[in-house]
Amino acid sequence: MKKKRIVSTLLALLLLASLPVSALAAEWDIGKGDITVNAESGGQTVRQGGGAAVPDSAPVITGTSKENNVTINAESGQTASVTLSGVNIDVRDKGKAAVSTTGEGNVSIELNGGSTLRSGYEHAGLEKNNGGSLTIADEDKNGKLTAWGGQQGAGIGGGSGKDGSNIFITGGGVNAIGGLAAAGIGGGLGGNGSNITISGGKVGATNGLNGAGIGGGQHGSGSNITISGGEVNAIGGDSSAGIGGGHTGDGSDITISGGEVSASGGKSGAGIGGGVYGKGEGITVSGNAQLKVRGGRVQGDYGTGAGIGGGGSYGTDGAEVEPDICALNPGGKIEYYAPRSSMSGTPNKTVTNPTGDFVWDSGRVTKPATCTEKGVRTYTCTGSTHTRTEDIPALNHSFAGQAYVSDNNATCEQDGTKTIRCVRYGRGGCTEKDTVVD
């Protein structure tokens, strides 16, 4: 009986050991060595130091280190998932990134408690090198992350010479501080910031010199930036926009559709738009967005930045650009503040759409579609100069209702032919016809 119990116990242990452990959610202390998370088609593993790879689909990284860092790799088509739980990594003296992402897949980082990342020279605090997306989330509403870039590295995004793109923040208290010449969130020195979306959380993005709060690093532009929710405070460094271009960079295709957003340009930088010498265009404010903007003050002989629009240039202030407010709800507004003024005081100007005066018309065809080419319909916002376009699908060839017409009659020695033409034959360059033997 005793032997049977021993055998049964051993069998149970063997069975337990054979069960898949990919759902394991273990804690990994960064103080015990470098951590590498690897998501492949066969599952996700974690390796620490020189140890073996351990299956773990939801690792929780904790602890403190001034030596070790975290690498999160995701293969194409895979998503690597990691939780940062009260982790503090300061590798400024080691010349490397505190946390970096690699591979062609996606990376998802959950925040739990307060974590701080500080990276070394030319590296971003949270350095995004993966080809897919980087998502920062906070499902439990208790997470915070502070990410400091080293010189030339973004707080969150690209290292020196690298772009910061496909970044999504859905929640958490996120504070991103760019290093010299890099964005808070976006590109490093010389890098662009694009496809950046903030839909929730409390987000601060700042830089001290030549990088945008959100967007491009020095000489980099910011584009396709969307804020749809949360609280966002973006402060550009000298010569840079709060949201948009870094020093000499442009800001374009920027949409504020919700949330409470404050965007302040550094010296000669726009609140939203271009850095010094940079343009601002394609800026939309819609929904119930609560937006405050302030252009940067003069610096030497360089003019002020626009609230929304261009950065200043030598002897000239940045040009203000009228944002598209055609979809701004009565509850939404834009408040403009003068350079140097407090953004908690009275604005210089407030823009609203209280009665829906700014609306899109029904549109007009500006390029007719043909059988083979798409057309274009253009809409104009009433009361403004803004337009938008949409494609009209190609019509494709049609022989409906058409009859074959004899080209030549058959003879005793030769077949005749007859032809049917597309209903739009001769219009829009259409020459489509079908000829058959009669």
Locations of the language-model features?
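Extracellular modular ligand-binding repeats in secreted and cell-surface proteins
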Residues: 354-438
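N-terminal secretory signal peptides that target proteins for export/translocation
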Residues: 1-3
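A composition-driven surface/loop motif
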Residues: 5-9, 16, 23-359
